[in-house]
Curated annotation (Swiss-Prot):
Top-rank lineage group of the source organism: Bacteria
A GO cellular component annotation in the UniProt record: plasma membrane
UniProt similarity note: Belongs to the OXA1/ALB3/YidC family. Type 1 subfamily.
Gene Ontology process terms (BP): protein insertion into membrane; protein transport
Name this polypeptide is given: Membrane protein insertase YidC
GO molecular function, one term: membrane insertase activity
Record keywords, A-Z: Cell inner membrane, Cell membrane, Chaperone, Membrane, Protein transport, Transmembrane, Transmembrane helix, Transport
Function statement: Required for the insertion and/or proper folding and/or complex formation of integral membrane proteins into the membrane. Involved in integration of membrane proteins that insert both dependently and independently of the Sec translocase complex, as well as at least some lipoproteins. Aids folding of multispanning membrane proteins.
Topology versus the membrane: Multi-pass membrane protein
Length: 531
C-alpha cells in the first residue's frame, strides 16, 4: 500500500478512536458508599480579618423554617431560613428547551431537602445545616444597576452569633456572601467554618445537559475535574483553591475565594448518592467579645468565557478546551465577534470557515499540486514495483531516485492536510462546548446549533460532498485501495449524525469550499501544463 493511503487510513482510525477517547461523555456511575477521605495536599492556614464586635445576643427560640425569595434580572433564588441556605436557583435568561415556553434552567434544586446548597457548618460553634436563622427580610427585588443585602442571623445557646450576609447586584450572575461570627459568651470557642455544596449524582433534568457533569476545582494554577469513579476509593482534597464547584457542559455553580478565605475544597461521594463539596476556611478561634469575618463570592451562571473572565479568580478556566485551548479561544472570540455583526451564529460559522480556508489556501494548493505530480508518476512507479518486486530495498532506492529526478515529495500531499488537523479539533472544541450555540437558530429546520440535525439532512449532504471531494482528488492508489478510502465518507457520516449541527455545518461548508478550490486548482494546473 502506498504511503499516502496508509497515512490516510491511520489518520482516519486515529480520528475515530481519538474522538471516542477524548470527547465521549464519561460513563454513568452507580452510587456506592464512600471510603474515608484522603487529603492530597495540606491546607494552608490564613488568618481571618477581624471585624467590629457585635452587641451580645441571646439565643433565639426554635421556630419552623420558611422560605425567603430574591429576584434579580439574571436569576431568581429561594432561600430557606434552615441554614440560611440557597434552596432553589433558576436562571431567567436560559431555558431547558429551545423555543418559547421553555422552563428556566435550574442550577440549585430542592431534590435534597435536608441538604440545601449553599449550606454552612461550624461544629465548634454548635452550628449545623439544620439550624434555623432569622432573616432580615421576607422578600427582596434587585433591579438593574441596584445593589442590595439580605442577612440571616443565628445565635447559639453559648452566645455565639453567626450572621450570613448575601450581597446582590442587579448586573450579573455573581454575588458575595460574608460570614460574621461573634463570640458573645464567656468562654473561648474555635471551629473550622465549612461551606457545603450538595448535588444529586443523577440530576433530575434533561440528561444530555449533564453529559460532562461533575466537580470542578481550580487550584495551583490547574483545573481539577474529579471523576465520580475516582471518588469510590476516597474523597479528593485540593488545597488553597481559587474556586470550587460543580459544572456541566454549559453551566457552572461555584464558590470563589476572597483574600485567602478558602483553605481547602474536599469532594466526596456520599452513601446516599450525592456529590458533596466541602469548602473549609481557616480555623476560627474567638475569645469572649471577639468577632471575625470570612468572605466568599458565589457564581451561578453560564459558561460564557467573557462572563466568567469578568468574575476573576481564573474562573474562565472552567471552560476546558484541552490541548487545543490556544487555538480554540481565538476561534471562540471570533465566533462571538462575527455574531455581533450578523446576528446569526450559523452565518458566523460560515464566515470563520471561509477565513480558515483562505488562510490555508497556499498549503491546499501545494498539496493538490504534489498529488497531481505523483499521479503522473504512477506508470513509472508501477514499472519499478514490477521490476523490483522481490527486492524491496532496491525498489525503495529506485523510487527515491525517481522522486528526486522529478523533484516530487512523496508526502507533499499529506503534510499540508496534517497541519489543518489541530485547527479542526480546536474548532470542534469551540463549537462543541460553546454555550453561545445553545438554542441558537440558523435557518429552516435547524433551530438549535448545539443539537444534532433532527432530520439528519446536513450530515448526509456532508457525506455526499466527501464522496465528490474524493472523486476530484488526484489518486495514487490502486482500485482496491480506492474502494477502501471510499468507505471513509460512510464512517464520517455516521460519526456526524449525532454531532451538534453547528459543527456539521462547519464541516459541510468546508467540504463545499474544498470542492470549489479543487476545481479551480485542477483547472489552473491543466492550463499551465497545456502551455
Amino acid at each position: 500500500m502506498e504511503k499516502r493511503a496508509l497515512i490516510a487510513v491511520v489518520l482516519s482510525i486515529l480520528f475515530f478512536y481519538g474522538y471516542t477517547a477524548l470527547f465521549s461523555p464519561p460513563p454513568k456511575e452507580t452510587p456506592k458508599p464512600v471510603a474515608t477521605a484522603t487529603q492530597s495536599q495540606p491546607a494552608q492556614q490564613v488568618t481571618a480579618a477581624p471585624v467590629p464586635v457585635a452587641v451580645p445576643a441571646q439565643p433565639q427560640p426554635a421556630v419552623a423554617a420558611r422560605d425567603v425569595s430574591v429576584d434579580t434580572p439574571a436569576y431568581s433564588v429561594t432561600f430557606s431560613t434552615q441554614g440560611g441556605s440557597i434552596k432553589r436557583l433558576d436562571l431567567k435568561r436560559y431555558h431547558e428547551t429551545a423555543g418559547p415556553g421553555g422552563k428556566n434552567v435550574t442550577l440549585v434544586s430542592e431534590d435534597n431537602p435536608s441538604n440545601y446548597t449553599i449550606g454552612l457548618r461550624a461544629p465548634g460553634f454548635g452550628l449545623d445545616q439544620n439550624a434555623v436563622f432569622v432573616p432580615s427580610a421576607d422578600a427582596l427585588t434587585v433591579g438593574p444597576g441596584e445593589k442590595k443585602q439580605l442577612s440571616f442571623t443565628w445565635v447559639s445557646p453559648a452566645g455565639v452569633t453567626v450572621t450570613k450576609t448575601y450581597n446582590f447586584s442587579g448586573d450579573g450572575y455573581g454575588l458575595e456572601i460574608q460570614y460574621q461570627v461573634t463570640n458573645s459568651g464567656s468562654a473561648r470557642v474555635s471551629s473550622p467554618v465549612q461551606t457545603v455544596q450538595t448535588y444529586p449524582l443523577v440530576p433530575k433534568v434533561k440528561e444530555s445537559r449533564f453529559e460532562t457533569f461533575g466537580p470542578a476545582t481550580f487550584a495551583q494554577d490547574k483545573l481539577f475535574e474529579d471523576k465520580v469513579k475516582d471518588l469510590e476509593s476516597g474523597a479528593k482534597t485540593h488545597a488553597a483553591p481559587l474556586w470550587s464547584g460543580f459544572a456541566d457542559k454549559y453551566f457552572l455553580s461555584a464558590v470563589l475565594a476572597h483574600e485567602g478565605s478558602m483553605a481547602a475544597a474536599t469532594i466526596r461521594k456520599t452513601a446516599s448518592g450525592y456529590l458533596e463539596n466541602t469548602i473549609s476556611s481557616p480555623e476560627l478561634s474567638l475569645n469572649p467579645g471577639e468577632g471575625r469575618a470570612l468572605t466568599y463570592r458565589l457564581f451561578f451562571g453560564p459558561k460564557d468565557i467573557d462572563v466568567l473572565k469578568a468574575q476573576g479568580n481564573s474562573l474562565e478556566r472552567a471552560i476546558n478546551l484541552g490541548w487545543f485551548a490556544m487555538l480554540a479561544k481565538p476561534l471562540l472570540h471570533s465566533l462571538k465577534f462575527f455574531h455581533n455583526y450578523t446576528g446569526n451564529y450559523g452565518i458566523a460559522i460560515i464566515i470563520i470557515t471561509v477565513i480558515i480556508k483562505v488562510i490555508f489556501y497556499p498549503l491546499t494548493h501545494s498539496s493538490y499540486k504534489s498529488m497531481k505530480e505523483m499521479q503522473k508518476l504512477q506508470p513509472k512507479m508501477q514499472q519499478l514495483r514490477e521490476k523490483y518486486k522481490n527486492d524491496r530495498e532496491a525498489m525503495n532506492r529506485a523510487m527515491m531516485e525517481l522522486y528526486q529526478t522529478h523533484k516530487v515529495n512523496p508526502v507533499g500531499g499529506c503534510l499540508p492536510m496534517l497541519v489543518q488537523i489541530p485547527v479542526f479539533f480546536a474548532l470542534y472544541k469551540a463549537l462543541m462546548f460553546s454555550i453561545e450555540l445553545r438554542h441558537a437558530p440558523f435557518m429552516l429546520w435547524i433551530t438549535d446549533l448545539a443539537a444534532k440535525d433532527p432530520y439528519y439532512v446536513t450530515p448526509i449532504i456532508m457525506g455526499v460532498t466527501m464522496v465528490i471531494q474524493q472523486k476530484m482528488t488526484p489518486s495514487q492508489m490502486d482500485p482496491v485501495q480506492q474502494k477502501m478510502m471510499m468507505a471513509l465518507p460512510v464512517v464520517f457520516t455516521f460519526m456526524f449524525l449525532n454531532f451538534p449541527s453547528g459543527l456539521v455545518l462547519y464541516w459541510l461548508v468546508n467540504n463545499v469550499l474544498t470542492i470549489i478550490q479543487q476545481y479551480y486548482i485542477n483547472r489552473s494546473i491543466s492550463t499551465a501544463e497545456a502551455k
